[in-house]
Regions:
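Bacterial Sec-dependent N-terminal signal peptides
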Residues: 1-25
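Ser/Thr-rich, low-complexity intrinsically disordered terminal regions
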Residues: 21-218
Length: 218
């Protein structure tokens, strides 16, 4: 009996020593540690395209206005006037134009053409929702010998904010200019006006590029 008790004591002491050495573990622990990976999530800051940032929306006497000059060496003011008038008369009838779009004024002696445009800016279109605004603007083509100056001005939107008030008129000067569409540091676009600013700039570029391409082919 004494020997039996001594044996038990010896076994207990041995197990204590083994546990103290910290060499025992669950059989699945090592596998778990091997398979354990540390995932580090790095959040990338969205970098805005410089074409939409500070200075992209120009103003003239506090009004949003874009102007491009198209040099046409060898063309008289009358020739350019005729070309621009023909182009704008077709432009106001293009598929994206609404019925209100039209060539509204001309000054034959000063070679100036004014067109009023009304079209949709579609921000998002899905099976379940449609987010869009009416873009209204004026194009002025001023023709001189060897040059056409094309100006986009009088820009405003009509937008339904789903507040029960229907379409609300929003001026470009209170939405897409630097003051309203950019944060104080001029490093980010402000949520809400960002989509208006991006799409209006894109549309302006498209209008000017198409006009420039048309004249270049003449």
């Amino acid at each position: 009996m004494k020997k039996f008790l001594l044996s038990l004591l010896f076994i207990n002491v041995s197990f204590c020593n083994i546990w103290a050495q910290n060499e025992w573990e669950r059989p699945d622990a090592a596998v778990g540690k091997q398979n354990e990976t540390v995932k580090t999530v790095t959040r990338k800051e969205k970098v805005e395209d410089p074409k939409y940032m500070a200075g992209a929306v120009t103003e003239n006497e506090g009004k949003v206005e874009w102007t491009c000059k198209i040099n046409m060496p060898g063309k008289s003011s009358q020739q350019l006037y005729d070309l621009c008038l023909g182009y704008l008369q077709d432009f106001v009838k293009e598929e994206e134009q609404l019925p209100e779009s039209d060539v509204t004024l001309v000054n034959k002696s000063q070679r100036v053409i004014v067109a009023t445009l009304n079209e949709w800016l579609v921000f998002k279109s899905t099976f379940l929702s449609l987010d869009r605004a009416k873009l209204n603007y004026v194009l002025v083509a001023n023709c001189t010998d060897g040059c056409v100056e094309l100006t986009m001005r009088n820009i405003f939107f009509r937008y339904d904010e789903n507040d029960g008030k229907g379409m609300t008129k929003i001026l470009a000067e209170e939405s897409i200019n630097d003051k309203n569409a950019l944060n104080k540091k001029k490093t980010k676009l402000v949520t809400g006006w960002a989509k208006f600013r991006r799409m209006t700039i894109d549309r302006k570029d498209e209008v000017f590029d198409k006009f420039r391409t048309y004249l270049a082919d003449k």
